[in-house]
């Protein structure tokens, strides 16, 4: 019985050490990415990084709360999306159709954006040229945005948005 407990404890320690090693390896892979604005498909295809693994490094900010999510937290997420729209407008980006967008911000403990994952949804997709311009605007936008709600650990927040046509 005692030997079994020691073996189980040893396996648990090895599993924990392996998990930490994998997280460190993933963190180093993320640091080497040439961009902080990317789609999950590009992340998998070009860099062999699975977004599920990334979420272990950046657990949802919502996990910090019990049954009640503070309105101030939700307001910050809304501000992220609204300010993103302002950044696109200030960059004089134009588009003729509405685009639906899934997005996930990955934030440091101080609220600065470390990575921005996105995916366009639905049948109407932007042209590759427009999407490239979108990525450039987002790269600049995330340099200055700060999520002003104290979580005090790395976290992520996802949601969807609709980019209305600029007719």
Where is each model-derived feature located?
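Charge-biased low-complexity segments
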Residues: 21-167
